[in-house]
Amino acid sequence: MSFSQKYFQENEFAIRDKKLKYYLSPTLLENNFKHGFFTKTSSEINLLLLSNRLKLNNKNCVLNQIHSNQIVFGSKTEEKQREEADGIVCDKQNQNLWIYTADCMPILFADKRKRLVAAIHCGRKGLENKIIKKLIKIFVIKDAQKKICLSQ
């Protein structure tokens, strides 16, 4: 059992909705960010159906994750034409960021004041190539505060 699964179980942040099971971060909830960390079973559900079920718009920002240190802005991504990268930064309101992980770490950054959110798929190669440092630099340029919300 991963640290985040154990943490969420102990703090009762697991949500179950028939086939859909996901976890919520207390930090993101306190700051009114819509979010969810989904299980493998949930990933089998079509992204548009998942967005509708969670009452999200259909502005899904999805990546073709390549185990790199590449970071893109959400407006460059579309579900049908995925950018090759492992990090994504919201640059418009109401964008849905989607990151998939197995043995890599999902890491979220958020700034309540700027309403800026970023997600990275952090594996060994991305970590070695300083993807986290690269994302922090983007937050500094955007005058955002850096706060890691969750890492597995």
Model-derived features: where do they sit?
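Active-site microenvironment for binding and transforming phosphate-containing groups
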Residues: M1-Q152
